[in-house]
A protein has these predicted regions:
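Generic structural signal for buried aliphatic residues
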Residues: 82-83
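Feature captures the catalytic cores and cofactor-binding loops of soluble hydro-lyases/lyases
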Residues: 1-78, 91-182
Length: 182
């Protein structure tokens, strides 16, 4: 929709209802507008959009079906997995999903540990936000993971790459940097 909101309301109450009925857990990402927002909010379907307008869709042409599309500064390809939260939308190429999940689990458990350590005054924000943690921090985190019930499902996460980077191994550091936005 190229950010069209007025006369660009691709999704409304009817299409949201159809998405819910046909897919159960599907949703929509629209780089444009929606309408019938009150009806949409009553349906348990996630729809990400740029704005709300009461006008119907007009002066739009479908250029491709099941092909690549540009949404903002991102490109979504057929088969990509869509991850959407209140913070934004990610398009994950299907061949990278396992790797992304692994890194997301690591980030999540590091957040649980990091927030706890900040609250206790054990580490500073600079230490928690560092790309490479010290060996002592990583070992303390591994102990924390084993003891804290919030981390139960992360007990088997492999931290060897992070430990190698903490010990100054250049290959590990280079590999670790691939997972950090610069």
């Amino acid at each position: 929709m190229f950010d069209k909101i007025h006369n660009g309301t691709f999704v409304g109450g009817n299409l949201t209802t159809a998405i819910r009925a046909k897919t159960v857990d599907g949703g929509a990402v629209i780089w444009g507008g929606v309408r019938d927002i009150e009806q949409m909010q009553k349906i348990d379907t996630q729809v990400c959009f740029r704005g709300v307008d009461p006008t119907p869709i007009r002066a739009c042409v479908m250029t491709e079906y099941n092909g690549p599309c540009r949404i903002g500064k991102a490109v979504c390809l057929p088969g990509d997995v869509v991850m959407a939260t209140q913070s934004g939308v990610l398009f994950i190429p299907s061949h990278l999903v396992a790797e992304v999940i692994n890194q997301a689990e690591k980030a999540h458990v590091k957040d649980i540990f990091g927030f706890e350590m900040l609250q206790r005054g054990i580490y500073s924000t600079a230490e928690i936000d560092a790309t490479v943690w010290s060996t002592e921090m990583l070992e303390r985190m591994q102990t924390f993971i084993k003891e804290d019930p919030r981390c139960e499902k992360y007990v088997d996460v492999d931290w060897s790459l992070e430990l190698d980077a903490a010990q100054g191994e250049e290959k590990a550091f280079t590999e670790l940097m691939k997972y950090h936005l610069v």
